[in-house]
Structure formats: C-alpha cells, structure tokens
Amino acid sequence: MTEIIQELDLNGEMLVRREKLAALRAKGNAFPNTFRRNALAQDLHTQYDEIESESLKTQGIEVKVAGRIMTRRVMGKATFITLQDMSGKIQLYVARDNLAEGVYTDDVGNWDLGDIVGVKGTLFKTKTNELTIRATEVHLLTKALRPLPNKFHGLSDQETRYRQRYLDLIANEDSRRTFIIRSKVIAGIREYFISKGFMEVETPMLQIIPGGASARPFITHHNALDVDMYLRIAPELYLKRLVVGGFERVFELNRNFRNEGVSIRHNPEFTMLEYYQAYADYHDLMDNTEELLRKLALDILGTTIVPYGDLKFDFGKPFERITMHEAILKYGAEQGIVKEDLYDFDRAVAVAQKLGIEVQKSWGLGSLVNAIFEEVAEHHLIQPTFLMAHPAEISPLARRNDENPDVTDRFELFIGGREIGNGFSELNDAEDQNERFDAQVAAKEAGDDEAMFKDEDFVTALEHGLPPTAGEGLGIDRLAMLFANANSIRDVILFPAMKTKS
C-alpha cells in the first residue's frame, strides 16, 4: 500500500513539473545553453572561507556558479538554496529585491529540488559565518522532471545505487569521493609509468585466441569475417609481442573480461594495469610495485597508512616476501601440514581431501599445492605481502626458477587477504612455452574450462627472440577499493554488471 501511495505522489509531482516545463517552452528556449560559470563551489570555499565578513563586503567579489539545487528554504521574500556542482556545495541567497522585477515570483518561485540553475552574484558571509552568494541574476538551465530520491533524505537502497548510479552520485557524497579517488589512482599510475620511460599502448579487445590468463572468456561473432571471437581476458601476449618488436617498456590501462562469477571481489568486466619491462626480473617488479603503491598512498591520502574497515595497511615499510611453500607451512601447521606433503602427489591429495578441497582429475602436484595455499594461508596475508615461487603447472607463461624448475620466478601481491597483483619474469624460451601451451590444451580437453588456449603466433614471436623481460598486472578496481575504503568491487565501478530487472 505504501508503495502505491509513493507512486501516486511521484506521478503527481512529475505532472506539476511537466506543467512548469510546458510553461517554459511556451516562453521560448526551455533549455538555454549560454550561461558560463567562472567558479566552482569548493574553489570558493578554499579561497574565501577564512576571509573576514567585512573584507568580503568591501571587495565586492562577483562570481558565476552553476549546479543542481539540493535544498531550499523559503523565507518570504528570500530563499536560501544549497547548490551542488562537481566540486561540492555552496549556499545561495536569492532575494526578491536583488533581482529584476518579477523574476523572484515568476521564475525562482517555480524552481524545484533537482533543477539545474546558473547564478551570478557577490560573495558575503551570513550571521553564522557561512560563505554565501547573494544572487543578482538567475537562470534556470534544466528543469528536472523527476524529484530527487526521498526528497533528498538520502539514497540508501544498494541495488538502486548500482542500477541508477547517477542518483547515487547526486545523493551520496561518499560515492562521489570514491570515484574521484579511483580517477586519482588511474592518473597516478599513468604518471608513474610515463615518468619511468614506459610507453602507453593499446592492444586488441577482440581476439581470435584469448590468452594471457587462465579464465573462461566471453564469446562473440564477427559477422564480416564470419568468425567467432573472444573478448580479451588479458592483454599479456600482445604486450610481449611489442617487447619482441623493440618497445622495451610498455604499459596498458584497459578493460579485461572474464565470463565468471559476480561477487564483492569479482566483476566480469574490470580494469587492469599491465606493464612489461625488458632487462628486468620479478624482483625489480616487486620493487616497482612497492614504490608505486607508496606514492599513490601519499598522493591520494597524504599518508602511507591506508585504513580499510577495521584494518590499517602500512605501505611505508618494506612488504613481506614469502614463498607459497613457506606460507603453507607457516599457516597450515595447525592442520598438521609438513614439508613432505608438498612434494608428493599422493600426500598432497590426502591433505587436500582432509581440508575439504574438491580435487580435480586434471590437477597435478602444482595445482594441489596452490589449492592448499588458498585454503589455509591466503586469508592470513593481511599486510602487503608478495607471495613467490608458484608452481610451474599453474604458471604457464612464467620463467622457471634456475635453482628449482618446478616453480617459477613469479609473485602475487596480497593485501587484506586479497590478490591485488600478479607478476613474473617472463618465459622467453619458445620451446618450453610451446610445451606448456600443449599441457594447457590437454588440461582443457580434460575438462578445465579455464585452461589457456594455444597461441601459435605468440610462439612464433618468441622464436624471433624475447629479451629477458618481466611483466605484471595490477587490478585497478581492487586498488580503488583499498584507497576508497570500499567493501565491494561494485562500489568502485560506476556501472557494475547487474542482472536484468524482471
């Protein structure tokens, strides 16, 4: 019953607003586009909040602002309005006697919450010392036909916030702050790599062979070529082709797509940084990553201590570096896991089954060890930690370790028990790469939907010679979650994947 009443109220209010718009149309141009502002709300606060009232009065500072009406208090012949623009809010004082004859009654009197207006006026301070603009000229720029959510008492319904992000951005200052932080993360990353001599590039989104990661791809069809194609799951193989071609430092900030589950940590469409550096190894990349994250924290938050929920991550001190085996033995001791369990297939199967892990037929020892790590150790990696020495079986593109060829020169960055990044010294042995691709094909034929496709052209590229190279991918969405203190990945993606409303 309440919903019906609310719908009737909404329809009634929209009818009134449409009538006001019709009256504007009858007068002429209902959507003018000639007003030009010369100031933003936050800039005015920054520049004039500390100026004394008398000084403002003497200076007679004239400004032009534009934005959305968020609140309105009518006090007879004057109205106080809160105006919101992209930078923040500022108060307007709109009085009948300061405007041309008839404007206050005929124009301002018909303004509604949500309308977009342009205002010219002078700065002053109210009795409560609030910086305010005394309007001398006003313009209705856009008539809002729908009222703000809940008369702007807030927008708390989570699903509505995701489906109608524009309302969320209007109503919730925290959401606007989150996406400003996300933008700063991306800008900071781009600035860092350009300053280090990297070249930004773009590689195909539509691919004949989806490669560069183990994941289930989205499939589409190219009508003109009459061929199935895939949305990319990673740009890795194309970026390494560029290193073969002589671009020795490259990076890309772009979207990847993986046809997998949706959760607070996963969205099928997500943003990644991938970069490749010739004549470097995975140790160099770990150093780069520490430096980058420390810089981002300082630039965005002004400190290397990053608050996240009840936790605080310290980006100021060296990140811990630990191998996968070391992590399992450290955090799996209570389950009775010993070193020998990680080097024998049957013993590893027994440990996995004891932990309740569903062992897949296609798994070898490396996959078992990885599954055991995810079960007993991953969630313990709270402070920034580089996990190293992953099994070669689960790292088909990474260079084998010189001392132990069963593992690779690879790392994953964990913060708060979540993987944030993945990097390794690149496999540049074309014959070894070909064999590993064949192993991935066998795994796919055995039922592993996430095993990699074989890319013959990439093997050909390696045969021309890839210099010693290291590469890394960092999840932008998860970094944004960290710096914005957001609990869900949907909170940092402007338009997250949502099931269609029935």
From Swiss-Prot:
Its EC number is 6.1.1.6. CDD domains: LysRS_core, LysRS_N. GO terms for molecular function: ATP binding; lysine-tRNA ligase activity; magnesium ion binding; tRNA binding. GO terms for biological process: lysyl-tRNA aminoacylation. Mg(2+) 1 binds at residues 412, 419. It is found in: Cytoplasm. Its main location: cytoplasm. Pfam families: tRNA-synt_2, tRNA_anti-codon. Keywords: Aminoacyl-tRNA synthetase, ATP-binding, Cytoplasm, Ligase, Magnesium, Metal-binding, Nucleotide-binding, Protein biosynthesis. It catalyses: tRNA(Lys) + L-lysine + ATP = L-lysyl-tRNA(Lys) + AMP + diphosphate. Mg(2+) 2 binds at residue 419. It comes from the Bacteria. It is an enzyme of class 6 (ligase). Homodimer. Belongs to the class-II aminoacyl-tRNA synthetase family. NCBIfam families: lysS_bact, PRK00484.1. HAMAP family: Lys_tRNA_synth_class2. This is Lysine--tRNA ligase. The gene is lysS.
